[in-house]
């Protein structure tokens, strides 16, 4: 914390603190003690001594405007004084320019906020004498101050007044210190109004205060660890504001130390004066009264050790600078000293003494909000040019901020360039940014850092730009030429990452959009230190690059200076013909890629590359070779793959990769998908480090002629759709994790070729049974056998697959039973048996998801299903023989029984209710037309109990952790259940809610819609969703315009998941019965906002609900609708039939059709309605009622 003298000296002519208080109540006690304590710290305080004598209020307002901080002391009699209230209104008007700190003296913040009790009564009485219509402003000011972070005090508590005063004084000193720091950062200008201040503010980075706070915590200047010696390294992207931050930080805290020093632009100083002068410069700053004539610390060690030192070093680019300045720092820096260093790159091995504590602070990019403020400081410094089109300019401003991604210097340069330019200029500039940088940004931000890179780092940076967003391991493999360890690439990538040229996200190598654009521009012109070209042609969306590419393609032979050559056939829009020797001269080519950006799967493009005659490709340096629709039978004989890492030839014409065995020690990835003529893989026999092999769609391939020694490193093997494959080699691949044999329709027998498998796909194969040695797959987690129509049974020892989590047997129509031993499988979570003939399910306690849909054999479920406590999802769609459903598991979230045309009864209760903070659950009984009346009553009773149970849970648990929609169900029916208090015919429900309807125990709402087919509609609907728009408007005329909110809720949905066919394969046509949709949703933040707005007042409210149904065929409509307001019960929580079923209504007399407060008339919603997302923000702001600084 800065000393009081340093704070006072910066603004001696102005009042620093203005005291706002009720004089009769506090002047001669608390306020006088507070005033004395503030003045004792040399803080200039203004107290309105002359108010009672009739001084003009305008004079007081001027004093408030001149102050830095206002202390609003809210007491019980505060609202008796118009003076206090008008001063408070003025303080609110100065928000952002004046720091207001409230002290709640013997009054609760909530009482101030809602003007309750005697405090509110006094305000009403004061209003009676108010002829200026100030009441609305007074209330707004009281609400404003109640939401600020302040100090509550109750004289009856144990806390002493003196303790409170000490806290207030400390807070004032801290605030003044920060204000002083901000002024010094912006040029120490006077804080009066005018253009000078706006210019100074624009030079300061938005969000600086937050950065200062974070750096303060890292350096530990205050707090429990302030006695530690700390060296903190401040790093960040070029232009991110390191120097601005360090200067502000130094000015803020230098007065806490008797010995301090700030050295800036150290790298430039070393260039100008040499490294040897650094130590002397630092000593002169630390010991200004000494005659420094030595360049070593030793003669001054005793004097330095008398006090802790505060050192800030900015602009260091070399490790030697730090070693020179901080050598043997333990011998001359007293314990508790703080040293802050700003560097252009992270240091991985700085001052490595064992007991030395080191910290790094990464300067963050600006948030979108701070970035927008920072940009607008420069782009709109003179507002007149943009007054006529503010919204359009602001929209464009946000796009520029998104592009800059919070980079302060880029935002500043963009803002300066755009200032006073036309809107059309802004729009064109925004379009050009991804393709071309302005010279100012390139030279001042990016080129400087790029020039500091070594040649290896420059090459790596531009190469990485070619493979932006690719996997880190993949990029390392491409960059390195020393083998699988890729140690050199690791060092280079780490260096680029430390210099913030790249970053790693989700194991992928990324770079800032600006750096990518810079690399895109620089790549085609890049040169080695000796002047030789190292061009990269890859981004045709850039006009300059496209032009270079066209010129390159017109040459009779390729260029030796090209390092990467990427050709996007989709962008070319035409076939390309290359000479047979076109690529022959590209001796330095490392990355060759002919692809189509139109399709991520690289399906066969319309445009192709033609090469008449034999292709010549004598390239040794190629790491990456991607050639979509490769036109030849094989790669040419002169191709040398000794450095090849990645080979990708999708949809090619090859029959074999190359004619003879070739040494390919670095080849790790091979993708030949949909090369339909491929017959022979013998060319890969020397690819001993191969990890991934994709042969999907290679229909001519009949076998894998590769031995285990050739595939020892293979982790992934994809043979999907290899319809010619009849058998697998009997080998053991010790590294294989994933094997895909999906749609190998001629594969009748499977045997284990790897005991390390994690995932196995056998979908659509002709296998009849699994081999007995399947039990060897002890690591198998996922087994997919969908549509294995010949599969009859599973091995008897299937439970030996102890870690299996997913088993998919969908469509295995001959599979009629499961081994009983599966009950021992404790890891199995997903079991999909749709389309099978299975009638009995083993009791697998770990199951979370069970699918039995389209099972035409099963008629009932085991009663033990209720014991599957982990089961969350049960799919019974189109189980046409299913007659009854037993009691379901307690934690079941989704039951889908759509189309169970024989279903008649359900258990009562449908499921056991337990007190819980349950997440959303859905029970679907659509098109179960044989459900009897009792079953429908059970479903509606379950829904009613579920709503009450959830409402009670919401009161017990934190509502913020409970999803909006909590329960929904649907079933055949034509009536709104009787427990809905409000009902209407049609899709619109309008009612008047009595005052206080949303207070106390109100938790949520239950919604109901009856949906039916439109007249003369015979086609079956495939899917639909039912929604409700809920509009609420208060009628409090005293508050001015009505307060309105609006939000949407999904009432329910269902999908048919395919068409039901008759025996001839035709779609069934039927008239669907009416269906009832019910949902329960929690009290949203919007309603809470309304509650806060009118808390303690008697305010009538009007509700307007409009239901709608959406289906692709537009065949459905809402016939009836209903609403129930749900309240938490007062009784202790009960379960099942003992549960209190009373759902409190919004009024004392529940109303149904024809009641006075429920109507079917249509209406419209006002356009000034506050939508829910805005209301959420408002509620969040209102809820931040902190009580301590």
From Swiss-Prot:
Residues 1138-1169 have a biased composition (Low complexity). Residues 13-176 form the TIR domain. The keyword Iron does not apply. LRR repeats lie at residues 641-664, 666-685, 698-721, 733-754, 755-777, 779-800, 801-825, 826-849, 850-868. It catalyses: NAD(+) + H2O = ADP-D-ribose + nicotinamide + H(+). Residues 1134-1189 are annotated as: Disordered. Residues 225-478 form the NB-ARC domain. Its EC number is 3.2.2.6. Keywords: ATP-binding, Hydrolase, Leucine-rich repeat, NAD, Nucleotide-binding, Plant defense, Repeat. InterPro entries: Apaf_helical (IPR042197), C-JID (IPR045344), Disease_R_plants (IPR044974), Leu-rich_rpt_3 (IPR011713), LRR_dom_sf (IPR032675), NB-ARC (IPR002182), P-loop_NTPase (IPR027417), TIR_dom (IPR000157). Signal peptide: none annotated. The active site is at residue 87. Probable disease resistance protein. Belongs to the disease resistance TIR-NB-LRR family. The TIR domain mediates NAD(+) hydrolase (NADase) activity. Self-association of TIR domains is required for NADase activity. This is Probable disease resistance protein At4g19530. It comes from Arabidopsis thaliana (Mouse-ear cress).
């Amino acid at each position: 914390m800065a000393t009081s003298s340093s704070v006072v000296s910066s603004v001696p002519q102005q009042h620093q603190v203005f005291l706002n208080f009720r004089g009769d109540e506090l002047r001669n006690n608390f306020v006088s003690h507070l005033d004395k304590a503030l003045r004792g710290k040399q803080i200039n305080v203004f107290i309105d001594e002359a108010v009672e004598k009739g001084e003009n209020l305008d004079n007081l307002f001027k004093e408030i405007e001149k102050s830095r901080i206002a202390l609003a002391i809210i007491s019980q009699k505060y609202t008796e004084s118009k003076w206090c209230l008008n001063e408070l209104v003025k303080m609110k008007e100065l928000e952002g320019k004046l720091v207001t700190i409230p002290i709640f003296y013997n009054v609760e913040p909530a009482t101030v906020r809602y003007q309750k009790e005697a405090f509110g009564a006094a305000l009403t009485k004061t209003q009676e004498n108010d002829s200026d219509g100030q009441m609305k402003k007074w209330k707004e000011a009281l609400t404003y101050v109640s939401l600020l972070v302040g100090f509550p005090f109750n004289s009856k508590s144990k806390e002493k007044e003196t303790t409170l005063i000490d806290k207030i004084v400390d807070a004032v000193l801290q605030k003044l210190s920060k204000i002083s720091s901000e002024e010094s950062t912006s040029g120490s200008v006077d804080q009066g109004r005018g253009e000078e201040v706006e210019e100074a503010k624009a030079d300061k980075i938005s969000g600086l205060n937050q950065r200062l706070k974070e750096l303060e915590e890292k350096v530990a200047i205050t707090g429990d660890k302030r006695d530690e010696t700390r060296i903190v390294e401040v790093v960040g992207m070029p232009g991110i504001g390191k120097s601005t931050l360090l200067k502000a930080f130094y000015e803020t805290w230098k007065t806490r130390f008797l010995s301090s020093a700030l050295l800036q632009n150290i790298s430039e100083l070393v260039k100008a004066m040499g490294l040897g002068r650094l130590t002397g410069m630092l000593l002169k700053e630390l010991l200004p009264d000494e005659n420094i004539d030595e360049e070593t610390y030793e003669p001054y060690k005793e004097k330095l050790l008398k006090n802790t030192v505060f050192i800030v070093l900015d602009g260091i680019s070399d490790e030697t600078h730090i070693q020179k300045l901080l050598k043997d720092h333990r011998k001359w820096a007293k314990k508790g000293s703080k040293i802050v260093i700003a560097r252009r790159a992270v240091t991985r091995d700085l001052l490595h003494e064992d007991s030395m504590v080191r910290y790094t602070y990464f300067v963050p990019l600006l948030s979108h909000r701070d970035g927008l403020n920072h940009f607008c400081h420069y782009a709109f410094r003179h507002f007149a040019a943009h007054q006529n089109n503010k919204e359009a300019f602001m929209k464009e401003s946000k796009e520029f901020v998104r592009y800059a991604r919070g980079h302060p210097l880029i935002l500043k340069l963009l803002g300066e360039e755009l200032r006073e330019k036309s809107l059309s200029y802004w729009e064109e500039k925004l379009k050009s940014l991804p393709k071309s940088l302005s010279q100012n940004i390139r030279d001042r931000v990016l080129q400087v850092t790029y020039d500091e890179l070594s040649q290896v780092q420059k090459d790596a940076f531009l190469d990485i730009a070619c493979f932006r967003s690719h996997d880190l391991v993949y990029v390392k493999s491409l960059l390195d030429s020393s083998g699988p360890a890729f140690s050199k690439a690791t060092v280079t990538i780490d260096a680029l990452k430390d210099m913030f040229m790249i970053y790693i996200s989700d194991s992928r190598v990324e770079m800032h959009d600006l750096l990518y654009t810079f690399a895109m521009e620089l790549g085609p012109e890049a040169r080695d230190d000796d002047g030789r070209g190292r061009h990269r042609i890859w981004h045709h969306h850039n006009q300059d690059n496209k032009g270079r590419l066209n010129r390159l393609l017109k040459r009779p032979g390729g260029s030796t200076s090209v390092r990467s050559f990427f050709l996007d056939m989709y962008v070319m829009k035409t076939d390309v013909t290359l000479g047979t020797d076109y690529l022959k001269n590209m001796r330095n080519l490392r990355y060759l890629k002919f692809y189509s950006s139109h399709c991520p799967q690289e399906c066969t493009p319309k445009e192709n590359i033609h090469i008449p005659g034999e292709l010549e490709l004598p390239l040794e340096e190629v790491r990456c070779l991607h050639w979509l629709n490769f036109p030849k039978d094989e790669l040419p004989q002169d191709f040398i793959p000794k450095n090849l890492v990645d080979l990708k030839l999708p949809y090619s014409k090859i029959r074999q990769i190359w004619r003879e065995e070739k040494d390919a020690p670095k080849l790790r990835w091979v993708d030949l998908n949909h090369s339909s003529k491929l017959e022979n893989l013998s060319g890969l026999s020397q690819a001993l480090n191969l990890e991934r092999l994709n042969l999907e769609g290679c229909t001519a391939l009949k076998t894998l002629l590769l031995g285990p020694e050739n595939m020892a490193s293979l982790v992934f093997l994809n043979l999907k759709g290899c319809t010619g494959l009849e058998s697998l080699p009997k080998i053991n691949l010790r590294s294989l994790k994933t094997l895909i044999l999906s749609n190998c329709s001629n594969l009748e027998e499977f045997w284990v070729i790897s005991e390390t498998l994690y995932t196995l796909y056998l979908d659509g194969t002709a296998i009849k049974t699994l081999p007995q040695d399947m039990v060897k797959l002890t690591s198998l987690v996922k087994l997919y056998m969908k549509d294995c129509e010949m599969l009859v049974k599973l091995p008897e020892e299937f439970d030996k697959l102890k870690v299996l989590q997913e088993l998919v047997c969908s469509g295995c129509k001959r599979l009629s039973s499961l081994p009983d031993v599966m009950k021992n499988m404790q890891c199995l979570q997903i079991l999909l048996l749709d389309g099978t003939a299975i009638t009995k399910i083993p009791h697998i306690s770990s199951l979370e998801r069970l699918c039995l849909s389209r099972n035409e054999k099963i008629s009932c479920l085991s009663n033990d299903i209720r014991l599957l406590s982990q089961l969350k999802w049960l799919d019974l769609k189109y189980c046409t023989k299913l007659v009854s459903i037993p009691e379901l598991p307690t934690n079941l979230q989704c039951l889908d029984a759509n189309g169970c045309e024989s279903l008649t009864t359900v258990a009562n209760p449908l499921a056991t209710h337990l007190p819980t903070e349950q997440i959303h659950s859905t029970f679907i009984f659509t098109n179960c037309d044989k459900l009897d009346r009792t079953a429908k009553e059970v479903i509606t009773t379950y829904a009613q109990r579920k709503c009450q149970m959830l409402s009670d849970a919401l009161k017990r648990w934190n509502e913020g952790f409970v999803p909006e929609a909590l329960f929904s169900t649907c079933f055949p029916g034509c009536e709104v259940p009787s427990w809905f208090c409000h009902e209407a015919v049609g899709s619109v429900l309008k009612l008047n809610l009595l005052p206080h309807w949303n207070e106390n125990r109100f938790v949520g709402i239950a919604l109901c819609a009856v949906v039916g087919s439109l007249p003369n509609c015979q086609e079956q609907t495939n899917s639909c969703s039912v929604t409700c728009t809920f509009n609420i408007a208060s009628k409090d005329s005293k508050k001015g315009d009505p307060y309105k909110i609006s939000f949407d809720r999904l009432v329910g949905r269902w999908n048919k998941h395919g068409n039901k066919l008759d025996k001839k394969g035709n779609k069934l046509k039927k008239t669907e019965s009416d269906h009832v949709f019910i949902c329960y949703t929690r009290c949203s933040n919007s309603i809470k906002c309304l509650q806060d707005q009118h808390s303690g007042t008697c305010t009538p409210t009007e509700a307007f609900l409009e239901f709608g149904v959406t289906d692709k065929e537009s065949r459905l409509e809402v016939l009836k609708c209903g609403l129930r307001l749900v309240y938490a019960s007062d009784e202790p929580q009960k379960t099942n039939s003992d549960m209190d079923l009373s759902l409190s209504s919004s009024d004392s007399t529940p109303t149904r059709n024809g009641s006075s407060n429920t109507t079917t008339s249509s209406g419209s919603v006002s356009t000034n309605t506050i939508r829910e997302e805005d209301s959420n923000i408002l509620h969040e702001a209102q809820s931040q009622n902190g009580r301590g600084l």
